[in-house]
């Protein structure tokens, strides 16, 4: 108790506030469409449908960054009715959200995302994907992948999903 009182009497002269965002994305698999996951093309694997390239990992990260910064979500950022975003890449979305955050006074601390799906085999390219996204955002990126043991739409191979968190700083 005494330690808490001492802390409360301290004056903070410069305040840096971390903000955390969480998000998810999911898309149905579309036969014959290129498979973009975490800004990498996976040859020989069907991609995901969508207004954009269907990169669930990149989309979840964009959404988590927007959530952490209080700037909305992917739908309000690009929307589905804007033709200039037809087929837009996850890479381009990450670049644009990074620039938006910088102009609003945010610094990206780090991002983490998990791919959920039966395909593609992500492990062999995980480090490559982490480096690509880290380079785009100018911040550490940590990625993982899992399956759902053949349960649900991802387990049946009907689609893919991703979960992401992001830490941004203000101040």
From Swiss-Prot:
Sites where the protein binds 4-CDP-2-C-methyl-D-erythritol 2-phosphate: 25-27, 51-52, 73-75, 146-149, 153, 156
Keyword field contains Metal-binding: yes
UniProt-annotated binding residues for a divalent metal cation: 25, 27, 59
UniProt-annotated site: Transition state stabilizer, residues: 51, 147
Pathway annotation: Isoprenoid biosynthesis; isopentenyl diphosphate biosynthesis via DXP pathway; isopentenyl diphosphate from 1-deoxy-D-xylulose 5-phosphate: step 4/6
Record-linked InterPro entries: MECDP_synthase (IPR003526), MECDP_synthase_CS (IPR020555), MECDP_synthase_sf (IPR036571)
Entry's Gene Ontology molecular function annotations: 2-C-methyl-D-erythritol 2,4-cyclodiphosphate synthase activity; metal ion binding
Nucleotide-binding among keywords: no
Cofactor(s) it depends on: a divalent metal cation
Keywords of the record: Isoprene biosynthesis, Lyase, Metal-binding
Signal peptide: none
BP GO terms, sorted: isopentenyl diphosphate biosynthetic process, methylerythritol 4-phosphate pathway; terpenoid biosynthetic process
Listed CDD domains: MECDP_synthase
Catalytic reaction list: 4-CDP-2-C-methyl-D-erythritol 2-phosphate = 2-C-methyl-D-erythritol 2,4-cyclic diphosphate + CMP
Family: Belongs to the IspF family.
Self-association state and partner proteins as the record states: Homotrimer.
Role played: Involved in the biosynthesis of isopentenyl diphosphate (IPP) and dimethylallyl diphosphate (DMAPP), two major building blocks of isoprenoid compounds. Catalyzes the conversion of 4-diphosphocytidyl-2-C-methyl-D-erythritol 2-phosphate (CDP-ME2P) to 2-C-methyl-D-erythritol 2,4-cyclodiphosphate (ME-CPP) with a corresponding release of cytidine 5-monophosphate (CMP).
Protein name: 2-C-methyl-D-erythritol 2,4-cyclodiphosphate synthase
Organism: Corynebacterium efficiens (strain DSM 44549 / YS-314 / AJ 12310 / JCM 11189 / NBRC 100395)
Taxonomic lineage: Bacteria, Bacillati, Actinomycetota, Actinomycetes, Mycobacteriales
């Amino acid at each position: 108790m005494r330690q808490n009182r001492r802390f409360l009497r301290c004056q903070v002269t410069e305040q840096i506030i971390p903000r955390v965002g969480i998000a998810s994305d999911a898309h149905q698999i579309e036969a014959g469409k290129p498979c973009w996951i975490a800004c990498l093309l996976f040859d020989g694997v069907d991609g995901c449908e969508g207004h954009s390239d269907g990169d669930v990992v990149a989309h979840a990260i964009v959404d988590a960054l927007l959530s952490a910064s209080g700037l909305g979500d992917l739908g309000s950022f690009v929307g589905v009715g804007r033709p200039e975003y037809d087929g837009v890449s996850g890479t381009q979305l990450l670049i644009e959200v990074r620039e938006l955050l910088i102009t609003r006074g945010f610094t990206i601390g780090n991002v983490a995302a998990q791919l959920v799906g039966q395909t593609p085999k992500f492990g062999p390219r995980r480090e490559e994907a982490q480096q690509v996204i880290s380079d785009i955002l100018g911040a550490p990126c940590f990625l993982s992948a899992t399956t759902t043991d053949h349960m649900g739409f991802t387990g049946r191979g009907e689609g893919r999903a991703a979960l992401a968190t992001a830490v941004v700083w203000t101040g």
